[in-house]
Amino acid sequence: MPRSRRTDEVSQYVSRLGSTRTAARLRFPGGFSGASRKPRRVAMLSVHTSPLHQPGTGDAGGMNVYIVELAKRLAAINIEVEIFTRATTGSLAPTVELAPGVLVRHVDAGPYEGLAKEELPAQLCAFTHGVMQAWAGQRPGYYDLVHSHYWLSGQVGWLAAQRWGVPLVHAMHTMAKVKNAALAEGDTPEPAARVIGETQIVNASDRLIANTAEEADELVRFYDADPAAVAVVHPGVNLDRFRPFPQGSDELRPGNAPSGRAAARARLGLPQDALIPLFAGRIQPLKAPDVLLRAVAVLLDRDPSLRSRIVVPVVGGPSGSGLAKPEGLQKLAARLGIADVVRFHPPVGQERLADWFRAASVLVMPSYSESFGLVAIEAQATGTPVVAAAVGGLPVAVRDGVGGFLVQGHEPEAYARALGRFADAPELVERMGAAAAAHAQSFGWDTAASATADVYTAALSDHRRRARAHHG
């Protein structure tokens, strides 16, 4: 299909936004040099989704967990965090203390309800106004640094950081060009306006935080990011919450994962001897829950005897663009002849989610794109292996053949083969689950917060150096 004139104009504009830079090797936290002073207080921006929202509902997902856990751990090392997010109901207090040292500030920007994420760019001016109003009531130098999450927040952070004279650290979480390169069937491409906005943010940021080395490479390759300004910080997992037994249990002993799984199944009303492949996440084409259902249909065609001992829970709610909704999946399950083994459940809180992970034989993540895939680490921390698409950050989160299996592509037959290995050798669940739990131990949020603080320190040091050079 020939490119439109409009597409060419956008491409030329994006090209002009990026400067030509010589390739340099990527430098990560620990490799930065500069003064050692870390910030006292950070303004964290999350325009489109509140850290108070339950993950798995609407646009709330892994990013919400990321912001909450990171902010708490930063506060624990004496970096105060104030999170600005859009108010979605009039009953919200202007400020909410999320934890000691962590404050959530609600900003009025557009109607409380009925505003899709795709409509939020029109409200960025109002959101920025609210952020500036909050800042105006503080003493000079109140915020040492701005840390924005997702491109909408990056646009606000760009202006705020310049106005306050502080550095901007940005985390993309997802990128338009990367998503558009791997669209699921029925999904809607990200608009050119987002590509332009992300390119602007890359050039405006003092530091960019990537979840994995692959994401860092994508920032350089797709957006011409300065490699020296990109830092890799792996997200973490709440190891107190996601463990083979609930927190406070007296059964937290090595080798007890099987009894932990049995206890979780009893709490959730699941059969003890069943193969339970779990999908947990937002129901949208990007996450590809339909691939799991199709794979189960293939598996049952090959081995009809499995029907009496398989349960497929789908835990999550609708989100984003495309056609994937719970009712759509229910109809698909009926067409595939597997409605009797698939169970749909609404999104649940983190404690309950941990129980679903414990109960599962395997977590299935057939996503088309994942910057990291927090739920993969969370499930493994509970002692549950993962079958995931070999995309984005999932090869970092999942060690292929050790704590689960990575699948190339999205063909249901390939996922059916992976699930069949667990059906044929049930002991694989416990063996891989133990390896998965050991792997997850290296992804604590304390480590992520410490590395993020190093990025902040480097950004502050460079910012001061440039300011001194500018003023002679």
Curated annotation (Swiss-Prot):
Alphabetically ordered keywords of this record: Glycosyltransferase, Magnesium, Metal-binding, Transferase
E.C. designation(s): 2.4.1.250
Residues the record lists as binding Mg(2+): F357, R358, A360, T384
A single MF term (Gene Ontology): magnesium ion binding
Annotated catalysed reactions: 1D-myo-inositol 3-phosphate + UDP-N-acetyl-alpha-D-glucosamine = 1D-myo-inositol 2-acetamido-2-deoxy-alpha-D-glucopyranoside 3-phosphate + UDP + H(+)
SUPFAM superfamilies: UDP-Glycosyltransferase/glycogen phosphorylase
Recorded superkingdom: Bacteria
Binding locations of UDP-N-acetyl-alpha-D-glucosamine: Q54, P55, G62, R282, K287, V348, E370, E378
Binding-site list for 1D-myo-inositol 3-phosphate: H48, D59, A60, G61, G62, M63, N64, K117, Y150, T174, R194
Biological process annotations from GO: mycothiol biosynthetic process
PANTHER family (UniProt xref): D-INOSITOL 3-PHOSPHATE GLYCOSYLTRANSFERASE, GLYCOSYLTRANSFERASE
Family affiliation: Belongs to the glycosyltransferase group 1 family. MshA subfamily.
HAMAP family, per the entry: MshA
Subunit structure, as described in the record: Homodimer.
Function (record text): Catalyzes the transfer of a N-acetyl-glucosamine moiety to 1D-myo-inositol 3-phosphate to produce 1D-myo-inositol 2-acetamido-2-deoxy-glucopyranoside 3-phosphate in the mycothiol biosynthesis pathway.
Protein name: D-inositol 3-phosphate glycosyltransferase
